[in-house]
Structure formats: structure tokens, C-alpha cells
From Swiss-Prot:
CDD domains: ATP-synt_Fo_b (cd06503). This is ATP synthase subunit b, chloroplastic. GO terms for molecular function: proton-transporting ATP synthase activity, rotational mechanism. Keywords: ATP synthesis, CF(0), Chloroplast, Hydrogen ion transport, Ion transport, Membrane, Plastid, Thylakoid, Transmembrane, Transmembrane helix, Transport. The lineage of its organism: Eukaryota, Rhodophyta, Bangiophyceae, Cyanidiales, Cyanidiaceae. It comes from the Eukaryota. It comes from Cyanidioschyzon merolae (strain NIES-3377 / 10D). The gene is atpF.
Length: 160
């Protein structure tokens, strides 16, 4: 019995050893294939990430260039707007100054005309008063007339 048991144990041990060797070989192949597949997946993921990074960097560069161009356009528009505003301001200041000058001229003309009109009216009134006084005064009328005529001449010379 002992020999049979020993034989069985020895054959079981041999079978187990064979099984372990087979399992180790298959496990190595399976684990190796799994590792190769995993390595390939990691490699592909890294390549994809690298490609996405390159694409993102390129898009960032493009966006920065567009931003720079936009800033330049904004600066140009602001400069043009300032120039246009200055031109418009100068135009309206010129128009206002011309209007003021015209108003001054018209006012001066109006004042001159009114002054002449008043002087004319004063002369007329003085003449009428002088004539009336001459008619009412028995004194020598030529003296009174001479006096009023000299007054008229004085006022006329003064208003010129």
C-alpha cells in the first residue's frame, strides 16, 4: 500500500508539476498578450493625446493671432473714430465761429442803422423845435436858427 500510495502521490505530484508548468507557460503567454495589448492601448492613447495637444496648441496659436488682429483692428477703429471726431469738432467750431461773426456783423450793422435812424430823428426833432421856437419868439430868428444848426452839425459829426 505504501508503494501504491507513494506511486499515486508521486504521479499526482508529477501531474501537478506538469500542470503548474503548463499553467505558467499559458499564463505567461496570456499575461504577455494582455500586457502587449495594454501597452498598445497606452501607446495609442498617448499618440491620440499628443495629437490632441498639437491640435490644441495650433488652435491656441490661431486664436492668439486672431486676437492680435482683432486688437489691431480695434485700435485702428478707435484712431479713425478719434480723427473723425476731431474733424467733426473742428467743423462745428468753425460753423459756430462763422455764425458768431455773422451775428456780430449783423448786430453791428443793426446798431449802426439804429444809430443813424436815431440821429436822423433827433435832427428832425431839433429842426422842428427850432422852427417852432422861431415862430414863437419875436427875437431875431436867424440867431436861433444858427445856434440849432450848429448843434445839429455837432451831433452829426459826433455820430459818424
Amino acid at each position: 500500500m505504501h508503494t501504491l500510495l507513494e506511486t499515486l502521490l508521486e504521479s499526482n505530484v508529477i501531474n501537478i508539476a506538469i500542470l503548474v508548468v503548463i499553467l505558467i507557460r499559458f499564463a505567461r503567454q496570456v499575461v504577455g498578450e494582455i500586457l502587449v495589448q495594454r501597452q498598445q492601448q497606452v501607446k495609442e492613447a498617448l499618440e491620440e493625446a499628443s495629437n490632441r495637444l498639437k491640435l490644441a496648441e495650433q488652435q491656441l496659436k490661431t486664436a492668439q493671432e486672431e486676437w492680435s488682429q482683432t486688437q489691431e483692428q480695434i485700435n485702428q477703429i478707435e484712431e479713425e473714430a478719434n480723427q473723425t471726431a476731431q474733424v467733426v469738432k473742428e467743423y462745428w467750431l468753425k460753423q459756430a465761429n462763422e455764425a458768431i461773426a455773422q451775428l456780430k456783423t449783423k448786430t453791428q450793422q443793426s446798431l449802426s442803422q439804429a444809430s443813424r435812424q436815431v440821429a436822423k430823428q433827433i435832427r428832425q426833432t431839433l429842426i422842428e423845435l427850432a422852427i417852432e421856437k422861431v415862430k414863437q419868439t419875436p427875437i431875431d430868428g436867424s440867431q436861433i436858427l444858427d445856434r440849432h444848426i450848429s448843434l445839429l452839425s455837432y451831433h452829426e459829426a459826433k455820430n459818424r
